[in-house]
């Protein structure tokens, strides 16, 4: 309202905001906070048109969604935008079960009922979901086709399903799955012996075909079973897909000052999603050459950004987040419009 009153006052003095060049309006919109950004479309028809062009562009800054603590009576999810450090958006409670994966404006979680925009799921979508150790999801925002893959069990079995499937399709249990990442229809698998497998899930039969790469990846020459195990905390190796489609191995090792990594280029690693994203200097709100964590194996509540260049940990600065208990968190890339209308496009798979 304040912005509208200000516009009316300026118009009374003969100032016509619609006469501003569209490039200037676009620059102004890019510098506004989310709440002011959405109010700006009420200035005039020109501003509304430019605003629409800005909304259609994909969001390039990772947001954090925090899920409520089951012990809390009044439960709600929180959305944190790094561009607005002290602003936290509260949205409806999506349940207290862990979120397994995310893709754009979609979430994959274990619920007793499958919900999307207030409608119950079809029978095909209400499949039994394995008790999973890791899950990944990819969704085509235009067609709404989706692929979900997961790994579970002591032998690290893996399976996947696509939109329209009524049962899980097996991924050959070759060597024990340690980590998985999914981009488009390609599934990347990191096996326990250090080998890498890639499976194209776009055109498959009941069982996926996995192409193994001949090399082995190990973090240095160490194994988790060596005598130096006590020097390591939260040993974990993740496979990450870069912007160009190559795969990147991310080793998480603490209490080892003699080991360090540097990821070159204007990119950042979003470990939740298993991808890298553009992080150039002209994108405010994301730190280049860094890794975004939403929890460590020892603590799912340990959310931070690790800057590989400075070797420093940057924790969330918002007092509203640090003062409120939560069960777990996920990084995601919502669109501006999506975050303002109480989470449409929420997709949840069911455990019956």
Swiss-Prot record:
F-box domain span: 14-60
SUPFAM superfamilies (UniProt xref): F-box domain
One Pfam family of this chain: Beta-prop_KIB1-4
InterPro entries recorded: F-box-like_dom_sf, F-box_BR-signaling, F-box_dom, KIB1-4_b-propeller
Gene3D superfamilies in UniProt: 1.20.1280.50
Domain of life: Eukaryota
SMART domains on file: FBOX
Stored PANTHER family: F-BOX FAMILY PROTEIN-LIKE PROTEIN (PTHR44259:SF26), OS07G0183000 PROTEIN-RELATED (PTHR44259)
Identification of the protein by name: Putative F-box protein At5g14160
Species classification: Eukaryota, Viridiplantae, Streptophyta, Embryophyta, Tracheophyta
């Amino acid at each position: 309202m304040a912005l509208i009153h200000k516009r009316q006052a300026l118009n009374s003095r003969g100032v016509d905001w619609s006469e501003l060049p569209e490039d200037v309006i676009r620059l102004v919109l890019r510098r506004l906070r989310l709440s002011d950004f959405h109010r700006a479309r009420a200035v005039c028809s020109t501003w509304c048109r430019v605003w629409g062009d800005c909304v259609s562009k994909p969001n390039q800054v990772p947001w954090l969604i925090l899920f409520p603590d089951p012990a809390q009576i009044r439960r709600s999810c929180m959305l944190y935008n790094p561009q607005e450090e002290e602003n936290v958006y509260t949205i409806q409670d999506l349940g207290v079960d862990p979120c397994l994966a995310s893709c754009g404006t979609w979430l994959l979680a274990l619920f007793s009922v499958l919900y999307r925009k207030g409608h119950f799921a079809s029978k095909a979508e209400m499949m039994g979901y394995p008790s999973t150790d890791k899950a990944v999801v990819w969704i085509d925002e235009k067609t709404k086709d989706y692929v979900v893959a997961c790994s579970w069990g002591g032998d690290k079995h893996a399976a996947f399903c696509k939109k329209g499937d009524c049962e899980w399709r097996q991924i050959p249990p070759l060597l024990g799955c340690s980590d998985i990442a999914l981009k488009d229809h390609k599934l990347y698998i990191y096996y326990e012996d250090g080998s890498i497998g890639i499976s194209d899930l776009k055109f498959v039969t009941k069982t996926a075909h996995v192409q193994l790469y001949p090399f082995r990846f190990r973090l240095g020459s160490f194994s988790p079973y060596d005598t130096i195990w006590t020097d390591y905390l939260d040993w974990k190796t993740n496979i990450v897909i870069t912007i160009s489609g190559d795969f990147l191995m991310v080793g998480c090792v603490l209490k080892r000052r003699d080991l360090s990594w540097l990821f070159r280029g204007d990119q950042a690693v979003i470990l939740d999603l298993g991808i890298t994203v553009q992080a150039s200097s002209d994108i405010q709100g994301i730190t280049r050459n860094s890794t975004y964590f939403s929890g460590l194996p020892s603590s799912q509540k340990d959310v931070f950004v690790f800057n590989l260049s400075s070797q420093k940990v940057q924790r969330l600065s918002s007092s509203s987040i640090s003062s409120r208990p939560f069960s777990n968190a996920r990084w995601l890339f919502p669109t501006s419009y999506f975050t303002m209308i109480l989470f449409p496009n929420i997709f949840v798979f069911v455990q019956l």
